[in-house]
Amino acid sequence: MSLLLQQHLSQPWRFLDHTSFGPTFQALQSFAYDDTLCTSIGKSQSPPTLRAWVHHNTVVLGIQDSRLPQIKAGIEALKGFQHDVIVRNSGGLAVVLDSGILNLSLVLKEEKGFSIDDGYELMYELICSMFQDHREQIEAREIVGSYCPGSYDLSIDGKKFAGISQRRIRGGVAVQIYLCVSGSGAERAKMIRTFYDKAVAGQPTKFVYPRIKPETMASLSELLGQPHNVSDVLLKALMTLQQHGASLLTESLSADEWLLYEQHFARISERNEKLLAE
């Protein structure tokens, strides 16, 4: 049993299930939710929270992506794939969200000594514990050729199925992961490759954008050779929390948190419009 998980999970955890809100649930709302949770948990007004979320056919761009020379052509290409496009309020590059991708946010208070690496390791250990039978196969290292590459890409046999990011604001930490549960990892990667082809168009860029190789990405269903869906992977997450001492609470947001959420959502939406209009 992971000591890191035991240390952070053996306490009451609130669980928010945002996996079945449907196509009208916007990805911008998720970033507003996590900023809200960071704020209230950072002030010790709410317990640590696991939030599970699913969005339909959306590509989330990083701020650097939004400054590519032919960004409007890139966005039009994504719309041609029937995907909405937003720019997120934190670092990283383009990622795909759809009904076969489960996102998990572990939101907790930023305690002294809880480093950036500790945040990444906490999520990595959670995923390894969820898929205990495959623990030895799951690696955390950058997968060159994947979209949104990073040192905590999770892969099996060199094929990436998940990426971890982290946001720290107002005394709270949100460690977020997207898990490609079902569908084709390569097809998602081909769409992002098309985006970069159109948005870069052979012109100089201010950052090194990823050269996408679709064969470097796959879903858990493809990698494990058996069908998985969002619901059964979420159940694994909840069971793993309980196995490490968490008592799960199913309270919704408090009245104060709803007010905060509305403020965060308005701010994030306005910022997103500005970034897409530049």
From Swiss-Prot:
UniProt cross-references to Pfam families, sorted A to Z: LplA-B_cat
The pathway where this protein functions is: Protein modification; protein lipoylation via endogenous pathway; protein N(6)-(lipoyl)lysine from octanoyl-[acyl-carrier-protein]
Which GO terms label this protein's molecular function in UniProt? lipoyl(octanoyl) transferase activity
Reactions performed catalytically: N(6)-octanoyl-L-lysyl-[glycine-cleavage complex H protein] + L-lysyl-[lipoyl-carrier protein] = N(6)-octanoyl-L-lysyl-[lipoyl-carrier protein] + L-lysyl-[glycine-cleavage complex H protein]
Keyword Transferase among UniProt keywords: yes
Site annotation Lowers pKa of active site Cys: residues: 160
Enzyme type, top EC level: transferase
Q: Which family does it belong to?
A: Belongs to the octanoyltransferase LipL family.
Biological role stated in the UniProt entry: Catalyzes the amidotransfer (transamidation) of the octanoyl moiety from octanoyl-GcvH to the lipoyl domain of the E2 subunit of lipoate-dependent enzymes.
Protein's recorded name:
Octanoyl-[GcvH]:protein N-octanoyltransferase
Q: Which organism is it from?
A: Halalkalibacterium halodurans (strain ATCC BAA-125 / DSM 18197 / FERM 7344 / JCM 9153 / C-125) (Bacillus halodurans)
Q: Which gene encodes it?
A: lipL
